[in-house]
Amino acid sequence: MLALWLFQRFGLDVATTGMIFFVTGLCSAASYFVAVPLARRCGLVNTMVFTHLPANFFLVLTAFAPNLWLAFVLLIMRSLLSQMDVPTRSSYVMAVVEPEERPAAASLTAVPRSLASAIAPLLSGWLLSASAFGWPLVLAGLLKIAYDLMLLQQFRMVKPPEES
């Protein structure tokens, strides 16, 4: 849906869209390597939340970008931060649950993401058909910010053994 919004908002051609997603994908991949030392220094939950919050703020700001270059910069900044929660979340879940509960816990943490991925295109398509403004980006960013704040509130005191 992001590609559709970029096309609607800026008239972006397919080749430029591919280049944007290539660059943001590389940035996301690189961020995995930064997540590990950051988590060692700041803790797993803090790394998840305090990298995801600004990433989601950048997503919201992207909807308000007046031109493609600013949108591109915001998307790059987002991609540098938005995936650092993936390895840290996996590590955290595996550390705080009993070994026999780990497969169920891993599944349980994946289901909400899968459901959101299934519902998001339907809602985004409806929003984009009603307005060319980036409402899907704003809504997604705000929902993710709420998720991050709830995660911090619920789990900031639940330390994995290596952080105790």
Describe each model-derived feature in a short phrase:
Residues 84-97:
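Intracellular juxtamembrane helix-capping segments at the cytosolic ends
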Residues 4, 8, 119-138:
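Transmembrane alpha-helix termini and helix-breaking/packing motifs in multi-pass membrane transporters
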Residues 14-15, 99-109:
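Loop-to-transmembrane helix entry/capping segments in MFS-fold secondary transporters
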Residues 139-164:
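Multi-pass alpha-helical transporter architecture, strongest
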Residues 46-61, 141:
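Structural signature of the two symmetry-related core transmembrane helices
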Residues 1-17:
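Short amphipathic helix-loop junctions that connect adjacent transmembrane helices
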Residues 31-44, 128:
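Helix-to-loop junctions at the C-terminal end of transmembrane segments
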Residues 63-75:
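Helix-loop junctions at membrane interfaces in 12-TM secondary transporters
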